[in-house]
Amino acid sequence: MVDASSDLLPYIKEEVVPKSYTLFKEGDVSFADASEDTNDVAKAIEILNCNGQQIVSGLHTIHGRDNTDQTVIGYKGYAFASESFHKQIRRIAQGTKVFSVSVRNFDETYIGVPSKDEQAKIAKLLIAIDKRIATQNKIIEDLKKLKSAIVEMLLCNQSGESFKLGDVGCYVRGLTYDNEDVTENKAATIVIRANNLNYGSHVDKREVVYVNKTPTVSQILRKGDIVICMANGSSALVGKNSYYPFNDRQSTIGAFCGIYRTSNPLVKWLMQSQRYKRQVYQSLQGGNGAIANLNGNDILNMSFPLIEKEKSQSIIFTIEAIEKSLVANKYLHRLYYTQKSYLLKQMFI
């Protein structure tokens, strides 16, 4: 659903306006006519609140309109997002690497059209859920900004003494393994790689590699470790890190990653800060290889302001409270999204 009165839409220059086009009317639908993912072929948006604006359907889209006045405003966008409709699209979409549909393909598909009163109720419910999801997204983003501001102001923008990461912790290199070491056996050693890391998040263990190779004792991840991407073809990804919250004693890291191990509770937030990112950037300058990389000394030589113990306790309490709120609000977001997905599967035939 796109609200033309409030959502930001792209504009085109007058000199590239096509000679022939059809302007959107209230309730018209735009379908994606091609995608590399069958789930996104015929992905649809319904346009609301046009208010006389000159809006056209863009490249690789199909402009749809209810010419028989069988539907109410707001219903079509959800009907065309339903599981029932997309099952039909996946069956008829053509292509190998890129899948596509044509206007003629829509003659082979259908959506349920209940009474207009029933359509209005369905649209009202799903619009309300979408608005709540949007509100939840804003709450989450605001909490992230608040946490980041506290880290920058109370942990990084302080004068006085400083300390190096090497003063309060150690660095451990990742495990080197060969392709033949990789296995499907989930009892084998779990390898965490760069794709499992993201600033401000815990290590994501959903897509991991299992290997028949035993890491050293120090290479086994422990709860509280910080996993760092040390080398990557994209310099923007070098230095990204995540906190390891598990105590499974079965996981290690790949050769392009490293472990920073410390008992200092502030470090995991310092390593999300702009000060940390600037030091990563400075360490990468002068490299001339195809792969941007850090070494252990680059991490251990990074410096940050030294915070008094009494002050640090109150900062820890505040940031942990924000992180708990983030966890709760992300969970609530997933529940709303799950509810919407369930309704899109069950309410349309």
Protein language model features and the residues they cover:
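Non-catalytic DNA-recognition/assembly elements of restriction-modification systems
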Residues: E108-K116, M153-L175, N301, L306
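Short amphipathic coiled-coil heptad-repeat segments
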Residues: A128-K131, T135-K164, Y331-I349
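A short glycine-rich beta-alpha junction/loop motif
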Residues: Q54-I62, T71, E83-H86, R90-D117, ...
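Sequence-specific dsDNA recognition surfaces
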Residues: M1-S30, G166-D181, N195-I226, D248-R249
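Acidic/polar-enriched heptad-repeat coiled-coil alpha-helices
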Residues: K121-I127, K131, K138, I316-F317, ...
